[in-house]
């Protein structure tokens, strides 16, 4: 007989969307700060583009597994109104910067993927507490409204939803 815990963990292990209780469902979502390259970025300034906020940690194997997929998918979206904000929530910005330097050495860096550290003094968001040990993907439409929130593994179908928002 399955335990209650195993039943509750099933959707998560399958990568099914969970309610994003920490993400504001009313009011205007806020995300603003500086990228690791010193570029000011905010959801407000990105209106007119579909934005995927990918919350990750260098200590999260699932997160690290998904980051190359995000970069590969960006190749098909060059010149389109689509941006990925990779929001790192490690204790230190050094972990994010080490990852970014490795990308630059391999030529895998992408202009449409902007890295931000959630712990920076100039960072602001109203997303509340987000899980440290699993990725969280937040999709904002061109008007800046939260369209979808997924915790855990990012399902392949999410890219179909993004395509509809970008091309629709």
How should these model regions be labeled?
Residues 55-69:
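Conserved redox-active cysteine motifs that mediate thiol-disulfide chemistry
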Residues 136-168:
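Thiol-/selenol-based redox modules, centered on thioredoxin-like
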